[in-house]
Regions:
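Glycine-rich hexapeptide-repeat left-handed beta-helix
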Residues: 70-71, 75-161
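Terminal amphipathic alpha-helical/low-complexity segments used for targeting or macromolecular assembly
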Residues: 1-37, 139-161
Length: 161
């Protein structure tokens, strides 16, 4: 049984590595949602994956009304010290995953969460509901500073680089 699971896992790996090279052809015939669902992902209503990538769709549970930004990655596996770590990733309802973000295995994201663009959510992290994940921490939405302060902080960070 273990060898069958490994073979299936390798099939997924090859599929996801090669698929982008042929995506222009397949995109005419196969939308991303049915493709991910076909491979075992559980995806809620009104969820848009678009150009986001689900590695290990069999280890993916996504709630309703979620949105993935361009090239966002949700992965159910990671290699650590030569060992393969596999765990299911769960996203609640009304979750927005920013462009170029990476979500690693074992992550559980609550409802009404925004994961900022270019963010990484480390493995086994739990993000509470009604928060924004940015710079490695979850900020409750009620504690968020006004938009002009956020814009100023972003400009300051850009100037410092």
């Amino acid at each position: 049984m273990e060898s069958e699971e490994w073979l299936l896992y390798e099939f997924y790996e090859v599929y996801y590595v090669l698929f982008p090279y042929f995506a222009w052809f397949f995109s005419v015939f196969l939308d991303t949602r049915p493709r991910h669902t076909l491979f075992g992902a559980k995806i809620g209503k009104n969820t848009v994956i678009g150009n986001g990538r689900l590695f290990n769709p069999e280890r993916t549970i996504i709630g309703d009304n979620c949105f993935f930004g361009y090239d966002a990655i949700l992965s159910g596996h990671v290699y650590e010290g030569g060992r393969l770590y596999l765990k299911t990733v769960r996203l609640g309802n009304n979750v927005t995953v920013g462009a170029n973000s990476v979500i690693l295995p074992g992550v559980e994201v609550g409802d009404n969460v925004i994961i900022a663009a270019n963010s990484t959510v480390p493995k086994d992290r739990v993000i509470p509901p009604n928060s924004i994940w940015i710079r490695g921490k979850a900020i409750p939405r009620k504690d968020m500073p006004p938009a002009d302060e956020v814009a100023e902080a972003i400009d300051t960070a850009k100037d410092g680089q």
